[in-house]
Amino acid sequence: MLDTANYTPRLKAAFSETIKAAMKEEFGYKNDMQIPRLEKIVLNIGSGAESVRDTKKAKSAQEDLTAIAGQHAVVTKAKKSIAGFRLREEHPVGAKVTLRGDRMYDFLDRLTTIAMPRIRDFRGVKPSFDGRGNFAMGMKEHIVFPEINFDKIDVAWGMDIIIVTTANTDAEAKSLLAHFNMPFNA
């Protein structure tokens, strides 16, 4: 049985033991508070056109995202009506969840060590930063996560993963994520 009182995620321990020192040496930080760290990870599934015809699809996306994240996901709703898409205001269009703390480190560990190697023809992720030290990536199928039972899903959803850091530059954020074993391809 897992002792949750004394449990520390593997990547969180690695950050405090080795990654902090490596980042401090690499960028010459004078204070430990200058060292970039992970702030949160946001997961998003947009159920798209399927949810316009059937509102249960957004609920299905929410259940799958809850299983992946280990935390309750919320259903996202349309902000305004768009007649061309047959979309009405407050209509469910997807699901999202924000991970912080230990769950964030656990998810990042599962993402880099379990889910990404299961992606077909995987050659690494493209370094996609926003200029302020935040990283975003997309996955074509959410079924690469072991929490999803392939036999019970009706749709293979695409998924957005946004990793928010306290880094000021993209170089700092890329180095931080590389220390967390993020497999960049370039």
UniProtKB/Swiss-Prot annotation:
Keywords: Ribonucleoprotein, Ribosomal protein, RNA-binding, rRNA-binding, tRNA-binding
GO MF annotations in UniProt: rRNA binding; structural constituent of ribosome; tRNA binding
InterPro entries according to UniProt: Ribosomal_uL5 (IPR002132), Ribosomal_uL5_bac-type (IPR020930), Ribosomal_uL5_C (IPR031309), Ribosomal_uL5_CS (IPR020929), Ribosomal_uL5_dom_sf (IPR022803), Ribosomal_uL5_N (IPR031310)
Annotated GO biological process: translation
GO cellular component, one term: ribosome
Top-level taxon: Bacteria
Quaternary context: Part of the 50S ribosomal subunit; part of the 5S rRNA/L5/L18/L25 subcomplex. Contacts the 5S rRNA and the P site tRNA. Forms a bridge to the 30S subunit in the 70S ribosome.
Family that this chain belongs to: Belongs to the universal ribosomal protein uL5 family.
PANTHER family attached to this UniProt entry: 60S RIBOSOMAL PROTEIN L11-RELATED
Role, per record: This is one of the proteins that bind and probably mediate the attachment of the 5S RNA into the large ribosomal subunit, where it forms part of the central protuberance. In the 70S ribosome it contacts protein S13 of the 30S subunit (bridge B1b), connecting the 2 subunits; this bridge is implicated in subunit movement. Contacts the P site tRNA; the 5S rRNA and some of its associated proteins might help stabilize positioning of ribosome-bound tRNAs.
Name this polypeptide is given: Large ribosomal subunit protein uL5
Organism in which the protein naturally occurs: Jannaschia sp. (strain CCS1)
